[in-house]
Amino acid sequence: MENTTHLFLAVRFNCNKCHDPPFERWTQDQYYSLAAFFSQIGRKEDARFLGKKIGGSAVEGAKPLVEVIFNSGAGEVTHLRTSEVAAPSFPYEHEDTIGEEVPRLEKLAHWITSSDNQYFASSYANRLWGYM
């Protein structure tokens, strides 16, 4: 989740997992509400690369070289401070025009790329200027 918000919104959410940073506008509650969109993601090793690994150290074990990412349809995120299940929601008011039957990640993608999301537009404008 932190990588997605940093890449597409130019917002760093790393500290919000544990506390409300004193100099940030984003809260811990917003962190877990956004993280809930990712709670139903599943990963499994790609059968074509079975047994091939990458990385690995004394701190962290090796990971599959290639993983298949899929919508598992199940899973929730528990808020660290409240121990309650976090419901997926956007960090600010947004008119959601997609139906309830749409998977969470698709709703998130729709919000991230919507024309009224000023974070996405400025993130990509800045990224393009950086390449020039």
What residue spans do the PLM features occupy?
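Sequence context surrounding c-type heme c attachment/ligation sites in exported
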Residues: 1-63, 67
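Short, functional "switch" segments adjacent to catalytic/cofactor/reactive centers
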Residues: 38-132
